[in-house]
Each structure stands twice: as structure tokens, then as C-alpha cells.
Design a protein with these regions (language model features):
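Non-catalytic, conformational "gating/processing" segments within enzyme and secreted inhibitor domains
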Residues: 1-151
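Acidic/polar loop patches that form or flank catalytic/metal-binding clefts of enzymes
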Residues: 47, 65-67, 171-173, 186-187
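Charged/polar, low-hydrophobicity segments characteristic of intrinsically disordered regions
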Residues: 68-72, 171-181
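Alpha-helix capping and helix-coil boundary motifs
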Residues: 117-121, 169-170, 196
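Flexible, low-complexity segments enriched for small/polar residues
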Residues: 132, 136-167, 176-247
Length: 247
């Protein structure tokens, strides 16, 4: 499910062994990206105030770094190795820092969140956006564009969005609706999509039954073809329309 994917992989600890961040002002970046890219879409009906309220709800949501202090670095190599090994499993994992959370009341997409709470604010925001009708249509459109054509028929998008809503965001069922549809097998969709450079390289390696290469060489080939790994400069990701990769 979309929501479980967004909400998974994080412990519930609220007592991280790191210093609380200083108050540096509200950053709207992820609030905007959550609404614009991952859920409702750019035309999903949210406002600038919704962006601010979502950003407020997500204050305190962060991850565990591991930055050894000077004393740790001066310890014997064996002790330091054990220390790093003990901390590595937690590095990069989610944690909620209540010391930097905005606990005031909020209103997100017309839904009121009472004040005085903590991590529940962000969890409620995920519930709200996951079940918003615009999210169903946005995700359905992206998947139909990925599997059928650059301009998928509205009728297919409607059915896929209805599946998203009916199954509470079950992506597998949405994909099933798309790939078993008459539009998927239509002549209009035949060869309407092309592989990205990444897909070209990976499919070639699979066809050759090549062993995985941990060196940077494979990534370098993908980059030479125009799609450097993690090289997209904007947060919307690489284009998923055929016209961008033909020519």
C-alpha cells in the first residue's frame, strides 16, 4: 500500500542520543514535495497554507546520523571499530525528535489537528493525503503513463483511481487494473513506451545473464547514455515519457 510504504521502516523512539537542533525556522521543502510530487499532485487543490501546515506537522521528523566525536576517534582501533559497528544499524533510520516539533494546532486540507501532540501530527497528515481523491487520481495517472502511454486515456485513469480508493491505496491492485485493461492491449498503446537508459542497460545485463558488477562501470555507462544515477537536479525525478528518451 502507498501509505504503508511511506510510513514503514522507522522505529518509534523519541529519545535519540543526539543534541536537539536549534530553532532555524520552518522549512517547507518536504511539505511541498509530499503534496506536489508524492500525493495530490501539482493541480491537486492544496494551497500554500496547506504546505506550511504540513511542514509544521512534520517538524521533528528526522533521521539518526552517526558523527563520532573527538574522544571516540582517539580510542584504540579495535574499540572504535566495535563502537561504529554497534551504531551502524541505526544510521539513517527515522526518529522523531519532540524537542523541535511544532505542537500547535494545525489545519491540513480542511482537517483540524488539535495542539499538544507529537509524532501523531505527521501520521495524521499521511492518512489525510493518502485518502484524498486527488492522490488517487495522481497516482493512477503516473502508473498509467508508466505502463500504457504518455497520454493515457481518462477512462483508464478513472478506473485505476477508483481501484486505489476502493483498496485503500493498494498499488498492486491498481497496477493489476491497468495491465489487464483493454487500453493496455490496444493498438494505440503498442510500442508507445521506450526504455530509459537505466532500463536499457539493466535489461541487456539480464539478457546476457551477466554477474552483478559492484564497480562504478555500469553506472558510468548509464550516465553516458544520459541518465546519471542520482543525477537528476530537480526533485520530480527522471521523465517517464517516451519523447524524452527518443532522439
Amino acid at each position: 500500500h502507498w501509505q504503508s510504504a511511506a510510513d514503514s521502516g522507522r522505529p518509534r523512539t523519541t529519545q535519540p542520543r543526539v543534541a536537539a537542533a536549534r530553532n532555524r525556522g520552518l522549512k517547507e521543502n518536504y511539505g511541498r514535495e509530499l503534496l506536489e510530487l508524492h500525493t495530490l499532485g501539482v493541480d491537486g487543490g492544496y494551497t500554500q497554507q496547506d504546505v506550511i501546515e504540513v511542514a509544521r506537522a512534520l517538524t521533528g521528523w528526522t533521521f539518526l546520523p552517526h558523527r563520532p566525536n573527538q574522544a571516540e576517534l582517539q580510542q584504540a582501533a579495535g574499540r572504535r571499530a566495535r563502537l561504529v559497528a554497534r551504531n551502524l544499524p541505526a544510521v539513517g533510520k527515522f526518529y522523531f525528535n519532540p524537542g523541535v516539533h511544532d505542537a500547535g494546532a494545525k489545519t491540513v486540507l480542511g482537517r483540524k489537528l488539535r495542539g499538544g501532540r507529537g509524532i501523531e501530527d505527521g501520521e495524521d497528515v499521511l492518512d489525510i493525503v493518502a485518502r484524498h481523491p486527488a492522490t488517487a487520481r495522481h497516482i493512477a495517472t503516473k502508473l498509467a503513463r508508466r505502463f500504457v502511454s504518455d497520454e493515457p486515456p481518462d477512462e483508464l485513469i478513472d478506473r485505476a483511481a477508483a481501484t486505489f480508493t476502493r483498496t485503500d491505496g493498494d498499488i498492486r491492485e491498481v497496477v493489476r487494473t491497468i495491465i489487464t485493461s483493454r487500453e493496455f492491449f490496444s493498438s494505440a498503446a503498442f510500442r508507445s513506451k521506450v526504455k530509459t537508459p537505466f532500463e536499457v542497460v539493466v535489461s541487456a545485463l539480464r539478457a546476457l545473464d551477466a554477474a552483478p558488477d559492484p564497480s562504478p562501470r555500469t553506472a558510468a555507462i548509464v550516465a553516458q547514455l544520459g541518465q546519471p544515477i542520482y543525477g537528476r537536479q530537480t526533485p520530480d525525478g527522471w521523465p517517464d515519457v517516451a519523447s524524452e528518451w527518443m532522439g
